[in-house]
């Protein structure tokens, strides 16, 4: 498979963006404070903002969005006898998510301002997680990817186990079992692909793996394992059950990291490994991804509609929206796959905003039950306005990023001639059910929170105050790109369209190979008693 040669970095921007927050985290225990965590808060905010600026500088100084291949490429021999190298780079698949990660993390630090219990440990974990998540998107070596993938598991586990709600131990244990257990498939697939040629030193680099002529059976086996691993993180129904429990116990900044970044790791990995490195298997598995996407959309939307717990309602809404990512990845059109990429960025912003507002509302009401929240709109008018704007973004209101990303997925899939017309019509019709349900459950949620039957005991609470400047600032920072992308999507799509076009072209070649092989088998085989070469019958 021909792919462009990587372009070497003039300056180690990506290594710096990974190592800077990790080194910053290691300094946290030595920061003097008076027990209130004021100093460490400001320190973490400065480190996260500098990391964000480093990624922005990397984009403007060393990244050309018109090029398909890897840029900002760095490769340093690490353990040569084992085939391990420090290899990082960015293309259109990774650069938008690197920027999203550093942006969301800096806002999550600001959202964590009220944290007073073990603040040093909390901000240490946020900074370490920042570097680990950037590494997931930037590394260009499959074993390094596995290490980065595992690195972000432990901060999330501790966030849930230490700062979570009443069922925090259950949620944390379930999270680590699901995610760490499924990660074994990444390691096994990576080792199998790296040692594929046999003999000599293995090579786990993406560029090397993309050029290997893996057999179709080998691809199908690796694809199956990776689909399970990445399906847990996306998540794909029925591998999703850890997510509502995790969101149900997490605090607001952890919500932002989970919804804004963690879920996108699964979508990115499906594009990077399943679609790019295993194209023949992807051509055969793609219809399954489409079906799973439809199941995600409908099942999660119906479940969200039935939820009375605010966190779980938004969690299932996230699962539903990620179904569009699956449909886009399963399509063989640049428009549909581009829509999946945009949906990941869009949902990262929208999901982070909604979950932050859930946390802010809980801090005031101390309840997550919609039945107990009625009538708080008269005391929290600005909060209601923020909720309304973010809910409209989530229900894909025209002029916001969610609308254009879902529209691209729909149009890209419906016009994709790889699939038969009846299949496209059925999938589009079923997916439309989720689009219809989303405004119903989100608008009814707003009504129940702010304009339902008044809870006199809740209304009388002195702490039922309106949004404060810090909260308004965080939501404003998220709404600006949501609206900006919605009004002018090219500002985002131009960053990755070249890489998406190249990916789709290679996958279409795989589709043609499979069709050609099937046609050859159909024409050359005939019924034969006592042999395994029986004909393939229509």
UniProtKB/Swiss-Prot annotation:
<dbReference type="InterPro" id="IPR010227">
    <property type="entry name" value="NADH_Q_OxRdtase_chainM/4"/>
</dbReference>
<dbReference type="InterPro" id="IPR003918">
    <property type="entry name" value="NADH_UbQ_OxRdtase"/>
</dbReference>
<feature type="transmembrane region" description="Helical">
    <location>
        <begin position="382"/>
        <end position="404"/>
    </location>
</feature>
<dbReference type="Pfam" id="PF00361">
    <property type="entry name" value="Proton_antipo_M"/>
</dbReference>
<feature type="transmembrane region" description="Helical">
    <location>
        <begin position="217"/>
        <end position="237"/>
    </location>
</feature>
<protein>
    <recommendedName>
        <fullName>NAD(P)H-quinone oxidoreductase chain 4</fullName>
        <ecNumber>7.1.1.-</ecNumber>
    </recommendedName>
</protein>
<dbReference type="GO" id="GO:0031676">
    <property type="term" value="C:plasma membrane-derived thylakoid membrane"/>
</dbReference>
<dbReference type="GO" id="GO:0042773">
    <property type="term" value="P:ATP synthesis coupled electron transport"/>
</dbReference>
<comment type="similarity">
    <text>Belongs to the complex I subunit 4 family.</text>
</comment>
<feature type="transmembrane region" description="Helical">
    <location>
        <begin position="425"/>
        <end position="445"/>
    </location>
</feature>
<dbReference type="GO" id="GO:0048039">
    <property type="term" value="F:ubiquinone binding"/>
</dbReference>
<feature type="transmembrane region" description="Helical">
    <location>
        <begin position="95"/>
        <end position="115"/>
    </location>
</feature>
<feature type="transmembrane region" description="Helical">
    <location>
        <begin position="143"/>
        <end position="163"/>
    </location>
</feature>
<feature type="transmembrane region" description="Helical">
    <location>
        <begin position="251"/>
        <end position="271"/>
    </location>
</feature>
<feature type="transmembrane region" description="Helical">
    <location>
        <begin position="472"/>
        <end position="492"/>
    </location>
</feature>
<keyword id="KW-0874">Quinone</keyword>
<keyword id="KW-0793">Thylakoid</keyword>
<dbReference type="GO" id="GO:0008137">
    <property type="term" value="F:NADH dehydrogenase (ubiquinone) activity"/>
</dbReference>
<keyword id="KW-0521">NADP</keyword>
<feature type="transmembrane region" description="Helical">
    <location>
        <begin position="175"/>
        <end position="195"/>
    </location>
</feature>
<dbReference type="GO" id="GO:0015990">
    <property type="term" value="P:electron transport coupled proton transport"/>
</dbReference>
<comment type="function">
    <text>NDH-1 shuttles electrons from NAD(P)H, via FMN and iron-sulfur (Fe-S) centers, to quinones in the respiratory chain. The immediate electron acceptor for the enzyme in this species is believed to be plastoquinone. Couples the redox reaction to proton translocation (for every two electrons transferred, four hydrogen ions are translocated across the cytoplasmic membrane), and thus conserves the redox energy in a proton gradient.</text>
</comment>
<keyword id="KW-0520">NAD</keyword>
<feature type="transmembrane region" description="Helical">
    <location>
        <begin position="340"/>
        <end position="360"/>
    </location>
</feature>
<keyword id="KW-1133">Transmembrane helix</keyword>
<dbReference type="InterPro" id="IPR001750">
    <property type="entry name" value="ND/Mrp_TM"/>
</dbReference>
<feature type="transmembrane region" description="Helical">
    <location>
        <begin position="314"/>
        <end position="334"/>
    </location>
</feature>
<dbReference type="InterPro" id="IPR022997">
    <property type="entry name" value="NADH_Q_OxRdtase_chain4"/>
</dbReference>
<keyword id="KW-0618">Plastoquinone</keyword>
<feature type="transmembrane region" description="Helical">
    <location>
        <begin position="11"/>
        <end position="31"/>
    </location>
</feature>
<feature type="transmembrane region" description="Helical">
    <location>
        <begin position="43"/>
        <end position="63"/>
    </location>
</feature>
<keyword id="KW-0812">Transmembrane</keyword>
<feature type="transmembrane region" description="Helical">
    <location>
        <begin position="119"/>
        <end position="139"/>
    </location>
</feature>
<feature type="transmembrane region" description="Helical">
    <location>
        <begin position="285"/>
        <end position="305"/>
    </location>
</feature>
<keyword id="KW-0472">Membrane</keyword>
<keyword id="KW-1278">Translocase</keyword>
């Amino acid at each position: 498979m021909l792919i462009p040669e990587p372009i070497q970095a003039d300056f180690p921007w990506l290594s710096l963006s990974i190592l800077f927050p990790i080194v910053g985290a290691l300094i946290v225990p030595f920061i003097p404070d008076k027990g209130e965590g004021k100093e460490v808060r400001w320190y973490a905010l400065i480190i996260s903002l500098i990391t964000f600026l480093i990624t922005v500088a990397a984009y403007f100084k060393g990244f050309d969005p018109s090029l398909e291949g890897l840029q900002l490429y760095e490769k340093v021999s690490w353990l040569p006898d084992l085939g391990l190298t420090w290899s990082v780079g960015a293309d259109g698949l990774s650069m938008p998510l690197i920027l999203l990660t550093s942006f969301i993390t800096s806002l999550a630090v600001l959202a964590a301002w009220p944290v007073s219990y073990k603040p040093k440990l909390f901000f240490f974990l946020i900074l370490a997680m920042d570097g680990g998540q950037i590494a997931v998107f930037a590394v260009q070596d499959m074993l390094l990817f596995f290490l980065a993938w595992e690195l972000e598991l432990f901060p999330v586990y501790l966030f849930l186990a230490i700062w979570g709600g009443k069922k925090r131990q259950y949620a944390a244990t379930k999270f680590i079992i699901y995610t760490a257990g499924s990660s074994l498939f990444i390691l096994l697939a990576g080792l199998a692909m790296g040692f594929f040629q046999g003999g000599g030193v293995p090579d786990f680099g993406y560029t090397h793996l993309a050029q290997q002529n893996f057999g179709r059976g080998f691809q199908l086996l690796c694809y199956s394992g990776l689909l399970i691993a990445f399906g847990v993180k996306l998540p794909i129904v029925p591998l999703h059950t850890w997510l509502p429990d995790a969101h149900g116990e997490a605090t607001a900044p952890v919500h932002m990291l989970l919804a804004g970044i963690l879920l996108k790791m699964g979508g990115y990995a499906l594009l990077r490994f399943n679609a790019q490195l295993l194209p023949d298997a992807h051509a055969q598995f793609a219809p399954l991804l489409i079906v799973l996407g439809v199941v995600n959309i409908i099942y999660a939307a119906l479940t969200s509609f039935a939820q009375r717990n605010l966190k779980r309602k938004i969690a299932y809404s996230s699962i539903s929206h990620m179904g569009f990512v699956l449909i886009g990845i399963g399509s063989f059109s640049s428009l549909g796959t581009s829509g999946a990429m945009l949906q990941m960025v869009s949902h990262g912003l929208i999901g982070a905003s909604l979950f932050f507002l859930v946390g802010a509302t809980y801090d005031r009401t101390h309840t997550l039950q919609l039945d107990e929240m009625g009538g708080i709109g008269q005391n929290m008018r600005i909060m209601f306005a923020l909720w309304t704007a973010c809910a409209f973004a989530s229900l894909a209101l025209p002029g916001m990023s969610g609308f254009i990303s879902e529209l691209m997925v729909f149009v890209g899939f419906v016009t994709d001639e790889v699939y038969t017309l009846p299949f496209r019509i059925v999938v589009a019709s079923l997916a439309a059910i989720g689009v219809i349900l989303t405004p119903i459950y989100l608008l009814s949620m707003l009504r129940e929170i702010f304009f339902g039957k008044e809870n006199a005991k809740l209304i009388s609470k002195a702490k039922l105050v309106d949004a404060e400047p810090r909260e308004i600032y965080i939501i404003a920072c998220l709404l600006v790109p949501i609206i900006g992308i919605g009004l002018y999507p090219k500002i985002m799509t131009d960053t990755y369209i070249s890489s998406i076009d190249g990916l789709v072209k290679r996958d279409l070649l795989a589709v043609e190979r499979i069709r050609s092989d099937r046609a050859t088998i159909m024409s050359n085989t005939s019924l034969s008693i006592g042999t395994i070469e029986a004909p393939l019958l229509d």
